[in-house]
Swiss-Prot record:
Gene Ontology molecular-function annotations: peptidase inhibitor activity; toxin activity
Protein family according to the UniProt entry: Belongs to the bradykinin-potentiating peptide family.
Keywords: Hypotensive agent, Metalloenzyme inhibitor, Metalloprotease inhibitor, Protease inhibitor, Pyrrolidone carboxylic acid, Secreted, Toxin
This protein's record includes keyword Cell inner membrane: no
Function (record text): This peptide both inhibits the activity of the angiotensin-converting enzyme (ACE) and enhances the action of bradykinin by inhibiting the peptidases that inactivate it. It acts as an indirect hypotensive agent.
Assigned GO CC terms: extracellular region
Residue numbers carrying Pyrrolidone carboxylic acid: Q1
Tissues in which the protein is found: Expressed by the venom gland.
Superkingdom: Eukaryota
Organism: Bothrops jararaca (Jararaca)
Keyword Secreted tagged: yes
GO BP terms, alphabetized: regulation of blood pressure
Protein's UniProt name: Bradykinin-potentiating peptide 11i
Subcellular location: Secreted
């Protein structure tokens, strides 16, 4: 279960 990635981490 993945939450939102922090800004700066590429998708």
């Amino acid at each position: 279960q993945n939450g939102p990635r922090p800004i700066g981490i590429p998708p």
